[in-house]
Amino acid sequence: MIQEILLLGNPKLYEVSGEVTEQDWKDLPRWVEDLHDTLMEYRRTYGAGRAVAAPQIGIQKRLLYMYLDKPYVFVNPVLTFPDEETYELMDDCMSFPGLMVKVRRHKRAVIRYRDGNDQPGEMALEGDLSELLQHEYDHLDGILATMRAVDDKSLFYELRKRNL
């Protein structure tokens, strides 16, 4: 079911999310469906969006959903960085559509997680995907891209047209 995306300023976006527990697994299929439906609706509306974090729809759990060529579910992910190489880029967010933020991200990352079937997984990420998962992972810790702006002049407004 499509859920409301929490917007910049909502206090829930700044909370640290709890682990998905054994008792939570019964709710996981519904949560994943809600994340999927919400992401697809955002794509239809704005023509963009590749991933969403559970806290963005009010679920304070360590759960990420990404849809590229197929769906990816990351339960209780852990993100690490194999080296210190970083780069700057313009970042946006479903929680503040139209606002762009210049941030610094690691060029490479490794994410370890459980999938939607409780199987362990690991992905090495580089460039665009590394940045995407760092952005979504930050949501689990109550960190927004606006908090990672490289300086106080790194916020830009961008008008997005609604796809009709």
Q: What are these model-derived regions, one by one?
A:
Residues 1-164:
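Positively charged
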